Amino acid sequence: MTVVLGLGSNKPWQQYSSIELLVKAVRALKALLHDIRFSSVYESAPMYVTDQAAFCNMVVAGRAEDSLSPHDLLDQIHKIEASLGRDRSREIRNGPRSIDIDIEFFGNKKIRFSDSQNPLKSLEIPHPRLNERPFVLIPLLEILNKSADNVDSTLYAHKEEFMQMLKVTGSDGVVKILDAEAFEKSV
């Protein structure tokens, strides 16, 4: 089944820039997903907490093995984030981070799971704020336009809906800074 992830970074870690952190994250995700396709990298103004650096964002789509559950994927994502310098215990919610990986879609699953004991286990799919995030919608539409034959038909069926969401949010402040082909050479 097709999994769609949104990736973002706006805080260098060790000697790595935000783009280098995205490259490292995609390399790690290759162990979890097959037939990976990725968008270009876009720069966008921060949302929610605006007093921080601009983000580098992209979307990755790939096929997950049937044995990989959404919660297993979430656990693996948290390990990747931690390995790339993300420390959730010390960060401001929606503040700067070395890497952020969100599950936007997991096939056609709809999940709404909340764990008050361990908020890191909470999961909502599709991502609940997709409709307000042009920095996810623009790269997602890029992938759908480039690889319609390789994308789950359920996801492709929502293309018009994504385009309508983008009309509402607008695309101001989201600028392509590295095309997918150039990014691919680094991965």
Feature-to-residue mapping (PLM):
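Nucleotide and nucleotide-moiety/phosphate-recognizing core
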Residues: 2-7, 11-93, 97-98, 107-109
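Flexible, gly/pro- and Lys/Arg-enriched active-site loops
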Residues: 47-55, 71-75, 79-187
